Amino acid sequence: MEESLVKRQGIAFMSIPAAGVHGVSLINMPRNLTLLGRGVFAARRILKEFKPDVLFFTGGYVAVPVALAGGYVPTLLFVPDIEPGLALKSLTRFADQIAVTTDRSQKYFRKKVLQTGYPLRSDLALWDRQTASRHLGISGELPVLLVFGGSKGARSINFAVMNNLRELLAKFEIIHISGELDWQYVKQNREQLPMELAARYHALPYLHEMGAALAAADMVISRAGASALGEYPLFGLPAVLVPYPHAWRYQKVNADYLAWRGAAIVLEDRRLNDELLVTLNVLFENKNKLKSMRAAMFELSHPRAAEKIAGALIQLAGV
């Protein structure tokens, strides 16, 4: 996926061998260490040919070989989530400067920290509600829910929506971006709807124009990845967040922060199916609550985040 996104922007893409080592079994550790070593050699070759003025890391184990190979190059580390993962923590020793999304991240680092906000694609801001609704075929007669589980989808969110689909469509128009994994199941459910309800259900496996979906929606139901800290504030979009329970706790920290700021409601994954419909009904019956959530989300927006990061990179590169 990363390769196709990078190439779509006309940027050269190169891959290297890499593998994580934290939490890896003793059986797999030799293999992963070998991949790490091969990644360092591959990164050295690429850096020697490319001769970068600055390195920019956003985490992930694939960054470790590049950091080891490029210790002589000025480096900016960007922390997208509030709490840095283990890979990001291991990269801090190589960073000349650290950029963070919110001030909550500053306590994790001793080095100079720059709060930039979460950088967004410029095309997101091109959409307004009217244009987005027309593009997606939204009637605008009912409140609009955006259901989104990331590029691969979120099974528990998809299933909770399917289990409550007719009740939801009685009160809402829904944009449901399911991901490829559950798409056939979602498609089958859509085909079984009566015509009136099917017209309110805009289901897709993937949507490149995410700005349209965000601009058209009144509420989003999603995981709590780092993009929630940037995309939802840009549109002042209140959120029902369902942190992914089977990974590092960064999603829980992100969700709790947005809830603390009054911009989101947090539901546990295991209780989502039972609580989703009730939660949405309560929220949309309280117009003042929705209004305050929108305002709170707007307050967290950093529309110039990418510009700030670019400025930091230019300064480090000395150009």
Features from the language model and the residues they span:
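Donor-nucleotide binding loops and adjacent catalytic segments primarily
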Residues: 5, 129-134, 138-219, 251-255, ...
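Active-site-proximal region of nucleotide-activated glycan assembly enzymes
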Residues: 12, 71-130, 135
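Acidic donor-binding loop of glycosyltransferase active sites
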Residues: 52-54, 207, 211-229, 237
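C-terminal alpha-helical cap of glycosyltransferases
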Residues: 302-319
